[in-house]
Amino acid sequence: MNIVVITGASSGMGREFAMQLDRGLHSVDEFWLIARRGSRLKEIASGMQHTVKILPLDLTNEADMTVLTESLAEEKPVVRMLINCAGYGMMGDFTAVPIKEQTGEVDLNCRA
């Protein structure tokens, strides 16, 4: 099974990638949409032509990363495209942001 995986798919660039690729990409069987907000993923999936696997996961959470890893291992899809749009940012003086938040932001932006 050929799939497209999109993280951060519930809004912004992730959502837009899902919508645009759904219309123009015919060489894949399924889209895997990943984001924290499952209800938004369901809304997006309802408007898509392709089969969609909804994964309401928080990729900053190790248990949720395990769910994703296990899903990939179990189903063994061919990932034709990986679009990493999950992420967050903080505004303001970085010295006022706790180091845990800073490293969490970098970690998510690199892994997801």
Role assignments for model-derived ranges:
Residues 93-106:
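Substrate-binding pocket helix/loop in short-chain dehydrogenase/reductase
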